């Protein structure tokens, strides 16, 4: 398997532990919904002139596999595991507003109103294409011979990824996702890789990597503290409110046991609010919502992939992906080289 430019890797996505892992040793765990979302968004922005539905599906599929390719080249592996959302979510039984839609505050600003409308229309367009993600999950991935693709009713893809990491031992894991919930899974042998490709620059071509060292330097916390951070601070994307009036700064100070005092020596209001939330059980509830994996998540049994060039060619011809047929990387993967 060909490497991408190693100088570029060191500059933009260095992760010392993973750079020394033998070829095909690292497993790439794919957050299926996240990568599908990013692939769809990229396809819409990169090819705005495409209006035919089949052509849009083709660009989404290309962008999806392009992200797999970039990550595989970065970690010199063809070992993929896919995790997908279940149709229902058990967390809603604990907290009905989990992942609920938040109502934006009223505004008289024409600019803000216009931006909100543009975001709404963009979201509706992505949602209209989302059914194709199920085609990727239920048809394309298994038909290509990827054996390790999982979805469990009531659980999120995040939970499946957490179980995989939990049972991986010392096997190197690269999580392909932009969901910050995954940060709590980072360890000496687990890193997170961004699925976003924002431009055609060098930096855009190489996936950015967040390992344990980088996480601690940036967030001033250990990855093991991240779920507690989200329980206290809140998780807007999942509609978990957190403690009222407490932001990232005070949450970090509290979790690190640093002073949170006024000039007169009395505790600041944020600290009092956090302590009250621990006492009344609020944090216990929020922790159950944000900590991975969710209680009861099934174990994952991994198998061997069943790749063949015949399956790959059939998929490429069906979705008009002739350029993938000519790609040496995919020829290596599905040709068994």
Kindly give the residue locations of the regions a language model identified:
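Accessory alpha-helical DNA-binding modules that contact the DNA backbone or grooves
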Residues: 222-300, 321-325, 331
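Long, highly charged low-complexity segments enriched in Glu/Asp and Lys/Arg with interspersed Ser/Thr
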Residues: 313-337
């Amino acid at each position: 398997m060909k490497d991408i430019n190693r100088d570029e890797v060191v500059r933009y996505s260095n992760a010392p532990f993973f750079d020394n892992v033998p070829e095909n040793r690292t497993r790439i765990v794919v957050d299926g919904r996240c990568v599908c979302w990013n692939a769809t968004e990229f396809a819409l922005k990169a090819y705005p002139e495409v209006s035919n539905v089949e052509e849009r599906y083709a660009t989404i599929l290309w962008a999806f596999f392009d992200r797999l390719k970039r990550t595989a080249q970065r970690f010199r592996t063809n070992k993929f595991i896919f995790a997908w959302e279940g149709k229902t979510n058990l967390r809603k039984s604990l907290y009905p507003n989990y992942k609920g839609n938040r109502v934006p505050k009223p505004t008289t600003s024409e600019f803000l109103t216009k931006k909100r409308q543009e975001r709404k229309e963009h979201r509706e367009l992505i949602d209209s294409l989302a059914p194709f993600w199920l085609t990727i999950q239920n048809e394309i991935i298994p038909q290509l011979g990827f054996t390790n693709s999982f979805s469990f009713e009531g659980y999120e893809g995040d939970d499946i990824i957490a179980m995989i990491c939990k049972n991986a031992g010392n096997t190197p894991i690269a999580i392909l996702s932009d969901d910050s919930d995954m940060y709590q899974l980072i360890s000496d042998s687990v890193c997170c890789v961004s699925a976003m490709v924002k431009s055609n620059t060098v930096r855009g071509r190489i996936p950015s990597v967040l390992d344990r060292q980088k996480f601690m330097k940036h967030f001033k916390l250990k990855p093991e503290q991240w779920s507690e951070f989200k329980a206290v601070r809140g998780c807007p994307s999942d509609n978990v409110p957190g403690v009222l009036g407490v932001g990232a700064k005070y949450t970090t100070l509290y979790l690190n046991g640093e002073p949170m005092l006024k000039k007169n020596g009395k505790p600041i209001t944020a600290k009092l609010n956090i302590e009250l939330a621990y006492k009344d059980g609020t944090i216990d509830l929020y922790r159950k919502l944000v900590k991975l994996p969710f209680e009861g998540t099934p174990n994952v049994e991994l198998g061997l992939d069943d790749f063949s060039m015949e399956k790959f060619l059939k998929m490429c011809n069906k979705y008009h992906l002739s350029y993938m047929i000519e790609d040496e990387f995919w020829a290596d993967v599905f040709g068994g080289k």
